[in-house]
Amino acid sequence: MNTFLLASSSPRRSEFLKQCHYQFFTQPSNVEETFDPTWENDTIVKELARRKAASVAANHPNAVVLGADTIVVHNGKHLGKPANVAEAKTMLMALSNSTHTVYTGVAILHGNKEHVFSDAAKVTFDELTPERLERYLQSGDSLDKAGAYGIQSFGAIFVSRIEGDFYTVAGLPLSKTAKALEKFHIYPNIG
């Protein structure tokens, strides 16, 4: 059985793989998350996921390596991870009472074999009251997530509707990822 590496420091992606009974090691990548602004959104997340996986695979040539990347797009603008609370507040106010799209790209590499895909989901936020927004910002939950919220945590209180896969919004579309991992003979460890 091949070693399976998650090229991510995301505690959410790690937790999702654990709850699905995958055995893996975590090896964060050190990749600049820059991209050509003319790229399509699905191209951005696929390319960044591939770069993350490739940077880890370069040091672990016999391992199956999974990289992932997520972006939030609202009115044509990319919302990455906020640099500070003020930026998080600006992002969340923009998302208030509107719909945005979350794109997640996944890349799985093993030697010369590569499988890269993306998925998208639409998320609609309720109108954010100043009180709810301030409580959320005080929690610290906004600073390490694209778009300044985590749908799988405290940020769920803002969401009124999802069109698409919840796990795509959370950062790792599990059903599609599981099918892709099977192509590399990586399966949940049930026994």
Swiss-Prot record:
Role according to the record: Nucleoside triphosphate pyrophosphatase that hydrolyzes dTTP and UTP. May have a dual role in cell division arrest and in preventing the incorporation of modified nucleotides into cellular nucleic acids.
Keyword field: Cytoplasm, Hydrolase, Nucleotide metabolism
GO BP terms, alphabetized: nucleotide metabolic process
Protein name according to UniProt: dTTP/UTP pyrophosphatase
Active-site residues annotated for this sequence: D69
Subcellular location: Cytoplasm
Gene field: maf
Cofactor: a divalent metal cation
Organism (species): Shouchella clausii (strain KSM-K16)
Marked site positions, Important for substrate specificity: R12, T70, Q152
Gene Ontology terms for molecular function: dTTP diphosphatase activity; UTP diphosphatase activity
The keyword Cytoplasm is assigned to this record: yes
Catalytic activity reported: dTTP + H2O = dTMP + diphosphate + H(+); UTP + H2O = UMP + diphosphate + H(+)
This enzyme's EC code(s): 3.6.1.9
Domain of life the protein comes from: Bacteria
Annotated family: Belongs to the Maf family. YhdE subfamily.
Chief place of localization: cytoplasm
Entry GO CC: cytoplasm
